[in-house]
Each structure stands twice: as structure tokens, then as C-alpha cells.
From Swiss-Prot:
This is Dual-specificity RNA methyltransferase RlmN. The active site is at residues 126, 378. It is found in: Cytoplasm. PROSITE patterns: RADICAL_SAM. Its EC number is 2.1.1.192. GO terms for biological process: rRNA base methylation; tRNA methylation. It comes from Bradyrhizobium sp. (strain ORS 278). HAMAP family: RNA_methyltr_RlmN (MF_01849). Reaction proceeds by a ping-pong mechanism involving intermediate methylation of a conserved cysteine residue.
Length: 403
């Protein structure tokens, strides 16, 4: 089965071209704008320059600390300013079209993005919340579809429609906080925030949407708003080498590499981008990543595929390749999806692989499979929902709005 996939992917292009560009609505949302951009919008509605810094701070607080969903909620902002903003702008986030809750507490949302082009279909992305005993992780998307064609990834089977804007990326986090009632001024169980970590591991390749991802993560990590530490934000890439160093310099978050193979021949099949940026170049970029240290280790993600990349020889070569890189290895049991050409490694083999890597001095946790009962493979909820009739989709949407 893997051989068939390899033949198919060998002929596939390394990267897809976006089918569309973003068209803003007539009344765009202020979410995702920098402080300088917010000041400019305030100037557009006649707020004097001497007041703009104060008004920006007020807006920032209401948007990202309190999670305001309308200008009317912003009671510390003058009524004239609120009215002026409401005439030209919104604070809308993506709309929840479907919500699924797993038996293990994992939540998955299908989010519809507003568009300013009546001729374009409204597009949808996925966002997943994974609660654990010591943290709550939100998995965020960066593209509608994906630039890449990774053989084992469900999103890789979808078209690349377009890049998300910074506002659409930040909006996913705000929707999750809305649904979980997790804003800073609200009570949560045990007094702790539910969303403590962000991972850019949803739909899309973040480093092929660099500027929007950078701008979004700088907003998310701002301690006067959403306030999630950069050490609790992880950006995952399949290996867009030219932008890895740039990510360290301009964003400064934790780095994860979707490695999945230790030989170029196999990685060319699993992650076709490897034909452009082979393993040696990728690992050198990791060695050069600004700020990497034992306290800020780079995570190497390794999906366990039965009979493909899970031998002890693979484990030995993995350890050899990572020598000198402050690293941990995240072993991921393959999450099957309809039509996939691979199977998950046997659990005994996963444990042997993990034990070898651990004994070589690397942390090698096996990621616990989560949300398998709710189409949790990345991109699968979107694909399955697209198959529904208009009436079925409307029913799903109504359920999501009333939950």
C-alpha cells in the first residue's frame, strides 16, 4: 500500500498554488490588527491622534483580555467612538458550523470564515481543543487546505484554497475561549485557564503563510491581552527551511519539525517537500534555530507507520541524525482516515522504538491518540461535512449555535 502512495506522490507537485486570495467583508473585523493598525482605524473615524494610544489600549483590553463580542460591551470607550467603530468595523470571529465532543473530552470545531466576495463559497477550517491533566492545548489552522501533499495526512488530500489572515488565526483562539468560557475575567473550574498552550498544527503549513502567522502569534503572546507565553506556543513545520531561522528571529516560539522519516528516499514519499529541502538541510536549520537550548528543545514529530518507518534501524538512525540538536521526539500513532494507504504501527513496536530513543538520551513520549471517535484526523471533519446535504449542514450549524 505504501508503494502505491509513493508512486502517486512522486508524480504530485511539491506544493500547491492557492486558488483564491482573501477578500475582506464590507465591514472588516478589527481582530488580528496590530496596535499601529488599530490606531490607523481610529484615525479613519476621526479620533484625534493624541487620544489614539489610549483608545488602542482600551480596544486591546476589551478584544483580547475580556473577549468582547460587540462594541457595546466596551463601556470604558466613549459612546461616540463606539458608534463610529460600529459603522465601519466589526469584532466578528469565525462562525462555529459544527462542534464535536469526544468521549475523552477533546473538542473539534468546524469554523466558517466570512468573505467579502459574494461569488466565493464561504470557506471552513478546523480547530481542536485537547484537555489534559496539566494543560489544555488548542490546535490551530493556518490555511484553508494545505500547500503540501504529505502522503499520510488527510489535509494533504484537500486543495489549497487560500492562506488565512492574522485575524482568522487569532479568531480561532477567540472562538475556543468563547465556547469554553475561558476569558480572563470569567470563572473557570479550579481557577485555572482552560487553554494554556497553542500549537500551529492544524490545517496548513504555517511557514508558507509566514506574515499572517507571525502577526497572529505576536498578538496571542502579548501579555496585555490573550497572554499565552511564547514558550507555550509551538509552530510546526514540514521543513520550509528558509523560514525556520526567520521564525526564530521574528516570532520566537517553540519549534516542531514534522520529520516522519530518517532517509531521504522515504521522506520524499511521505513529505514531498523533502525533495526541495532534504533532511540534511532541514537539520542544519534546526541547529541554527535562534534560542534553541536544553530549556527550549526542538520537537521532532514522528508518525508511526506500520512496516514503513518503525524499525529499530530507523530509531538508531534517528538518534544519530539528531546528535547535537537540543531535541525531544514526539512519537505519534497514525490516526487512520478513509482511503489512507498506511496503518498504525503495532503498540509493541512503538514501545520498542520509544525505549531505544529514550535510552539514547532523548525524551520520546508517545502521543496518546485523542478524539478518534469524532473524526479527529486533521482535515477529516471538514471533508466529511462537505459531503452533507444543505439541509444536514444547516442542522449541524443549528446544533453548534445552541450547545
Amino acid at each position: 500500500m505504501a508503494t502505491t502512495a509513493g508512486l502517486r506522490d512522486a508524480a504530485a507537485p511539491l506544493e500547491k498554488i492557492p486558488l483564491e486570495t482573501y477578500v475582506p467583508p464590507a465591514k472588516p473585523s478589527l481582530i488580528g490588527l496590530s496596535r499601529a493598525e488599530l490606531a490607523a482605524r481610529l484615525g479613519d473615524i476621526g479620533v484625534p491622534e493624541r487620544q489614539q494610544k489610549m483608545r488602542v489600549q482600551q480596544l486591546w483590553h476589551w478584544l483580547y483580555f475580556r473577549g468582547a463580542r460587540s462594541f457595546d460591551e466596551m463601556t470604558s470607550v466613549s459612546k461616540d467612538t463606539r458608534n463610529g467603530l460600529a459603522e465601519r468595523f466589526t469584532v466578528d470571529r469565525p462562525e462555529v458550523v459544527a462542534e464535536q465532543i469526544s468521549n475523552d473530552g477533546t473538542r473539534k470545531w468546524l469554523l466558517r470564515l466570512p468573505s467579502g466576495d459574494d461569488l466565493q463559497k464561504a470557506h471552513e477550517v478546523e480547530c481542536v481543543y485537547i484537555p489534559e491533566t496539566d494543560r489544555g492545548t488548542l490546535c490551530v489552522s493556518s490555511q484553508v487546505g494545505c500547500t503540501l501533499n504529505c502522503a499520510f495526512c488527510h489535509t494533504g488530500t484537500q486543495r489549497l484554497v487560500r492562506n488565512l489572515t492574522a485575524g482568522e488565526i487569532v479568531g480561532q483562539i477567540m472562538v475556543a475561549r468563547d465556547r469554553l468560557n475561558d476569558w480572563a475575567d470569567r470563572e473557570t473550574p479550579h481557577g485555572n485557564r482552560l487553554i494554556t498552550n497553542i500549537v500551529m498544527m492544524g490545517m496548513g503549513e504555517p511557514l508558507y503563510n509566514f506574515e499572517a502567522v507571525r502577526d497572529a502569534l505576536l498578538i496571542v503572546s502579548d501579555n496585555e491581552g490573550i497572554g499565552i507565553s511564547r514558550r507555550r506556543i509551538t509552530l510546526s513545520t514540514s521543513g520550509v527551511v528558509p523560514n525556520i531561522k526567520r521564525a526564530g528571529e521574528e516570532i520566537g516560539v517553540m519549534l516542531a519539525i514534522s520529520l516522519h522519516a530518517v532517509r531521504d528516499e522515504l521522506r520524499n514519499e511521505l513529505v514531498p517537500l523533502n525533495r526541495k529541502y532534504p533532511i540534511a538541510e532541514l537539520l542544519q536549520a534546526c541547529r541554527d534555530y535562534p534560542g534553541a537550548s536544553n530549556a527550549r528543545r526542538i520537537t521532532f514529530e514522528y508518525v508511526m507507520l506500520k512496516g514503513v518507518n518503525d524499525s529499530l534501524d530507523d530509531a538508531r538512525l534517528l538518534v544519530k541524525l539528531l546528535k547535537g540538536i537540543p531535541a525531544k521526539i514526539n512519537l505519534i500513532p497514525f490516526n487512520p482516515w478513509p482511503g489512507s494507504a498506511y496503518e498504525c504501527s503495532d503498540w509493541e513496536q512503538i514501545e520498542k522504538f520509544s525505549e531505544y530513543v529514550f535510552n539514547a538520551g532523548y525524551s520520546s513520549p508517545v502521543r496518546t491518540p485523542r478524539g478518534r471517535d469524532i473524526l479527529a484526523a486533521c482535515g477529516q471533519l471538514k471533508s466529511e461535512t462537505e459531503k452533507l446535504s444543505a439541509r444536514e449542514r444547516q442542522a449541524l450549524r443549528a446544533m453548534a449555535m445552541t450547545d
